[in-house]
Amino acid sequence: MNLAAYYPVLLFLLVGTGLGIALVSIGKLLGPNKPDVEKNAPYECGFEAFEDARMKFDVRYYLVAILFIIFDLETAFLFPWGVALRDIGWPGFIAMMIFLLEFLLGFAYIWKKGGLDWE
């Protein structure tokens, strides 16, 4: 296997990584550094902070975020499948139906366990 065709990709990654690290380092070294209580305080739309920024969040917010990611990934798989359905034929159709069935079974399990209830 000839890996010479991948040298431009490797060069691109090395130059991009090196340039990124160099520019961030130069900015840190040469940029002004004048820490202040006001600068380090969390910004809340121009108002004084109502409470500490490190407050506890309800676990349900994280559950909603994880469920959103799952639904988003499922949609990300559906769009290319729909575009390529004519080319992939019946095996691709059956594979996606199995994927959707697994997804729907997981969704039903979450629903049955009360993961979608907001009480």
From Swiss-Prot:
It is found in: Cell inner membrane. It holds the Pfam family Oxidored_q4. One of its GO terms (cellular component) is NADH dehydrogenase complex. InterPro entries: NAD(P)H_OxRDtase_bac/plastid (IPR023043), NADH_UbQ/plastoQ_OxRdtase_su3 (IPR000440), NDAH_ubi_oxred_su3_sf (IPR038430). It is an enzyme of class 7 (translocase). Keywords: Cell inner membrane, Cell membrane, Membrane, NAD, Quinone, Translocase, Transmembrane, Transmembrane helix, Transport, Ubiquinone. Its EC number is 7.1.1.-. GO terms for molecular function: NADH dehydrogenase (ubiquinone) activity; NADH:ubiquinone reductase (non-electrogenic) activity; quinone binding. It comes from the Bacteria. It is a multi-pass membrane protein. It catalyses: a quinone + NADH + 5 H(+)(in) = a quinol + NAD(+) + 4 H(+)(out). NDH-1 shuttles electrons from NADH, via FMN and iron-sulfur (Fe-S) centers, to quinones in the respiratory chain. The immediate electron acceptor for the enzyme in this species is believed to be ubiquinone. Couples the redox reaction to proton translocation (for every two electrons transferred, four hydrogen ions are translocated across the cytoplasmic membrane), and thus conserves the redox energy in a proton gradient. NDH-1 is composed of 14 different subunits. Subunits NuoA, H, J, K, L, M, N constitute the membrane sector of the complex. This is NADH-quinone oxidoreductase subunit A. It comes from Burkholderia multivorans (strain ATCC 17616 / 249). The lineage of its organism: Bacteria, Pseudomonadati, Pseudomonadota, Betaproteobacteria, Burkholderiales.
